[in-house]
């Protein structure tokens, strides 16, 4: 296609939202009217299924749940007065609590104001708040945010070292539907221990974000925590950023949550249009489906050309991969669906893996995220008539063209600037695109059985560890792996037993390892008395 034909093709496929000043360009994805025509029946079904989902249908059949994250930014859509009231009350509670913290009405018992947030959560309870904080938090926020989003002792040490004496002015958010998620529970227990060591009452600093009546809610209530905010069982973790999970930390940092919600609401309205060419989320789902032949054959590379959007690819990794990565479809057929997502930021990536994107395996499509406004301050000229922002834009356009010349597909999402409204719109755009794609390929995009399988396997390993330690505690002599395996009736688990013992020995957990580490089968282990 020559340059003039490509220009016309760009105009033919361009989507623009006037109120959000939001563009979606899929002209470099190889789409044709024939592709649209072929998938129109599937999209008609997907639009109808999405309409039913928003009306309160059981859209997550495996867990028997409604899927209601769209109601969070437009409570009038919720299917019952009770739900509408719960959503509005939760938002009002977030605003009131944040205002009281900012004013000092809610303050540390030692005096002064809260200055730090320690957010404890994992998965959607961390990735969304981290993305929004990186994108939108002011340079000098009313409270600085820190995250415990793993069960890594070295990570705990680093965060608590950063807090230092400011632990006494730290507000702790514990975010978990039940409170039983091991990583979140461990982070909470580590935090409690740090507060106790510092002579501080944890309850005077603690807030729970959880399901009403959950184990965590009961702990918070019985111990007199500062507040309890509701989560809803009809909102999944990866779509929870615009619930209390994300709104509370955002509001505490001084981010305008009304604009976040408004941006999402406006995008939701745009993505309800039952016409592929006039619906930006449908255009994304169409492009993904065409690129990967409906089987996820191409990876999704996310390249935001703005430092503040660095974490968008990590956020989308969970949203896309946890939603679409499924073994079976809704009819029980083995399909192994999914789209792999990775990315960093432009132009860093042009000095990293874009070399492979242009000249290596053509197993991907690129999504450029373009931000029109360079910054808030006037830019100097780094060359006559050229600013640093001109270079950023030029490198985006140059990479897009270089990929096109090698028949590497790409699409571009353009926003005017990074604001709460545009970030809310981005979140809503991809939530809807993922939902539509899930309907196109007939999978449940709202459960995560693979994650649950991993949790069960981890629990089994910890149970095995307890058995191993008990055997060694009771033995007067060193034991080899075979003897340990026989004693716990697990003769086929030599590798797991070895790996568990190696970890315990490395951490001075009472296990002594004897022998040559290069010969694991010859090692012996004993309990250090």
Curated annotation (Swiss-Prot):
Top enzyme class: isomerase
GO cellular component: cytosol
Source organism superkingdom: Bacteria
Cross-referenced PROSITE patterns: P_GLUCOSE_ISOMERASE_2 (PS00174), P_GLUCOSE_ISOMERASE_3 (PS51463)
HAMAP family reported for this sequence: G6P_isomerase (MF_00473)
Alphabetized GO MF terms: carbohydrate derivative binding; glucose-6-phosphate isomerase activity; monosaccharide binding
Name of protein: Glucose-6-phosphate isomerase
InterPro entries: G6P_Isomerase, Phosphoglucose_isomerase_CS, SIS_dom_sf, SIS_PGI_1, SIS_PGI_2
Functional summary from the UniProt entry: Catalyzes the reversible isomerization of glucose-6-phosphate to fructose-6-phosphate.
Main location: cytoplasm
Catalytic activity: alpha-D-glucose 6-phosphate = beta-D-fructose 6-phosphate
Name of the gene: pgi
Similarity comment: family membership: Belongs to the GPI family.
Cellular localization per UniProt: Cytoplasm
GO biological process: gluconeogenesis; glucose 6-phosphate metabolic process; glycolytic process
CDD domains named among the record's database cross-references: SIS_PGI_1, SIS_PGI_2
Gene3D superfamilies to which the protein is assigned, alphabetical: Glucose-6-phosphate isomerase like protein, domain 1
